[in-house]
Amino acid sequence: MAPKKKVTGLIKLQIKAGAANPAPPIGPALGQHGVNIMEFCKAYNAQTEAQRGNVIPVEITVYEDRTFTFILKTPPAAELIKKAAGVAKGSGTPHTVKVAKLTMDQVREIAEQKQADLNANDIDAAAKIIAGTARSMGITVEA
């Protein structure tokens, strides 16, 4: 077994799928850890090509020899909720001004998609988390 590489940094970014480029915020974040920025951009764009239009969070682990590995996460719940509700952004005052409505089926669908990244044991608990996020954005969840 090869000796373990020493980790020197962990970078978390949220980048549009298939649209990573060396411009800020990606360039400076990777540059200060000595990562080859173009190499990361090409690899990220290749892996996220199928999900164009979504924002995909990525966790980049940088090693001592300046190599890196990255893990793609599921899109943020807020992004999925906005897409399902068909709104550009949540409400500025969520408890007084409601901007859209979601059905429980839509919430369950988002919960299934996010299940891997959520701290929930079953789909019902995940749906409750998603419903809470929707409410905090000024989106009504109908039972």
Curated annotation (Swiss-Prot):
InterPro entries: Ribosomal_uL11, Ribosomal_uL11_bac-typ, Ribosomal_uL11_C, Ribosomal_uL11_C_sf, Ribosomal_uL11_CS, Ribosomal_uL11_N, Ribosomal_uL11_N_sf
Entry GO MF terms: large ribosomal subunit rRNA binding; structural constituent of ribosome
Physiological role: Forms part of the ribosomal stalk which helps the ribosome interact with GTP-bound translation factors.
HAMAP family, sorted: Ribosomal_uL11
Domain of life: Bacteria
Record-linked PROSITE patterns: RIBOSOMAL_L11
CDD domains xref list: Ribosomal_L11
GO cellular component, as recorded: cytosolic large ribosomal subunit
Species: Clavibacter michiganensis subsp. michiganensis (strain NCPPB 382)
Family, as annotated: Belongs to the universal ribosomal protein uL11 family.
Listed name of the protein: Large ribosomal subunit protein uL11
Bridged cysteine pairs (disulfide): none
PANTHER family with a match to the protein in the record: 60S RIBOSOMAL PROTEIN L12, LARGE RIBOSOMAL SUBUNIT PROTEIN UL11M
Post-translational modification: One or more lysine residues are methylated.
Keywords: Methylation, Ribonucleoprotein, Ribosomal protein, RNA-binding, rRNA-binding
GO biological process: translation
Entries under Gene3D superfamilies matching the protein: Ribosomal protein L11, C-terminal domain (1.10.10.250), Ribosomal protein L11/L12, N-terminal domain (3.30.1550.10)
The protein's assembly and partners: Part of the ribosomal stalk of the 50S ribosomal subunit. Interacts with L10 and the large rRNA to form the base of the stalk. L10 forms an elongated spine to which L12 dimers bind in a sequential fashion forming a multimeric L10(L12)X complex.
